[in-house]
Amino acid sequence: MLLLGLLLLTALAGARLLWNKWKYRSLHLPPLAPGFLHLLQPDLPIYLLGLTQKLGPVYRLRLGLQDVVVLNSKRTIEEAMIRRWVDFAGRPQMPSYKLVSQPYQDLSLGDYSLLWKAHKKLTRSALLLGIRNSMEPLVEQLTQEFCERMRAQAGTPVAIQKEFSFLTCSVICCLTFGDKEDTLVHAFHDCVQDLMKSWEHWSIQVLDIVPFLRFFPNPGLQRLKQALENRDRIVEKQLRQHKDSMVAGQWRDMTDYMLQGMGKPRAEKGHGRLLEGHVHMSVVDLFIGGTETTATTLSWAVAFLLHHPEIQQRLQEELDCELGPGASGSRVPLKDPSRLPLLTATIAEVLRLRPVVPLALPHRTTRHSSILGYDIPEGTVVIPNLQGAHLDDTVWEQPHEFRPDRFLVPGASPRVLAFGCGARVCLGEPLARLELFVVLARLLHAFTLLPPTGPLPSLRPRSHCGINLTMQPFQVQLQPRGAVAPGPSQHQ
């Protein structure tokens, strides 16, 4: 049976390659990279960037039964995702995507359509309008509580990655459900951890390359289905509670806003109706996209500062100059980041060197298009190599070096693409940037980051086939610099 399946798969692959070669014989396609085992590379984004030396910034890879176009420069990514955004706004409907999202109701993984646009508008409005006034004070409050917990562990090694993860999960829980109760936060945190671990396993990722394998026994697939059932059970419970208690015309959190907004008439006609399933998947996207991503970036920032204590000292001097020595009662000037230019530059440099999603989720062309003069047929899968674009030595001087000062000269360095760009830009970017700014400012103002006994944390990403650019576990010792600044409630 297995041999027959492999023979059939080989025959189908050969037939498809011949068909595509005939179908696109008159087109000027990007060059094709030799080989077909590209995904086995331990540091895939860097490997893909290396191929540009021979093939240029746009080329094709053969993955399974299809060719995939890779964009490796800021210029090509912005040309596709901003100037030709409609052409490249689609999302391929791969087996793993269909598995982890309710049918065609997911925002991050859903294909481009009028209904998708309405779904995006509702979620964006919930983030920017529904909770606009509560976002900043909430992040301040939870960060202050985080610093108090860290002060209680001062002088002992702390697994800072886990602490950041609970902090960011608490923020999302409060904004989404209006609740930071420990039981709920722990339930969602464990759910997200389990789900991402299951989804990123090679036994799931390979199904997108060789879909035929889904018909064979797969323990990893069963674990993922169990994680999805747990996820949906938790979200559905919260949706029921909100529907039973919300008041029309008022909203306590994002879930209230989206549940009430999904039934409102839309300006666009013919796109269908937003359903509760769309709200369900928006909640899922907020937790998946807003918990581990921000926590990982914060962890990378701490690791880089442990390697560069001179940058940490300059940051603390900047904070002391703006907020007072040690820890004072002043609030971080969130509405004017220019008052803390080195902190802003340091965040930008961390995002440049370690974009948490180094290879953006695949796009799909909605119609025939072109990039740098190459034809890109309709239905082509396109992958932006964000980390590759950030390490392009034709754009960045000494691209592999940690140099926040490169962002201190206005116009000297381009804006990083860590959150994507165009129609598929991360909707949570404003919240993520707010968290990065507040947490690092509060943390560095209150503590000096010191490495515990032993080697410094590794700056090499963990090698795996997942989506996020994760790092090796490490610990940090927090040395208090003075009394922690009072919380927002004391500044009335």
From Swiss-Prot:
GO terms for biological process: hormone biosynthetic process; progesterone metabolic process; steroid biosynthetic process; steroid metabolic process. Pfam families: p450. GO terms for molecular function: 17-hydroxyprogesterone 21-hydroxylase activity; heme binding; iron ion binding; progesterone 21-hydroxylase activity; steroid 17-alpha-monooxygenase activity; steroid binding; steroid hydroxylase activity. One of its GO terms (cellular component) is endoplasmic reticulum membrane. SUPFAM superfamilies: Cytochrome P450. Its main location: endoplasmic reticulum. It is a peripheral membrane protein. It is found in: Endoplasmic reticulum membrane; Microsome membrane. 17alpha-hydroxyprogesterone binds at residue 231. It is an enzyme of class 1 (oxidoreductase). Progesterone binds at residue 231. Keywords: Endoplasmic reticulum, Heme, Iron, Lipid-binding, Membrane, Metal-binding, Microsome, Monooxygenase, Oxidoreductase, Steroid-binding, Steroidogenesis. Heme b binds at residues 91, 120, 363, 424, 426. PROSITE patterns: CYTOCHROME_P450 (PS00086). Its EC number is 1.14.14.16. Transmembrane segments: none annotated. Belongs to the cytochrome P450 family. The leucine-rich hydrophobic amino acid N-terminal region probably helps to anchor the protein to the microsomal membrane. Specifically catalyzes the 21-hydroxylation of steroids. Required for the adrenal synthesis of mineralocorticoids and glucocorticoids. This is Steroid 21-hydroxylase. It comes from Lynx lynx (Eurasian lynx).
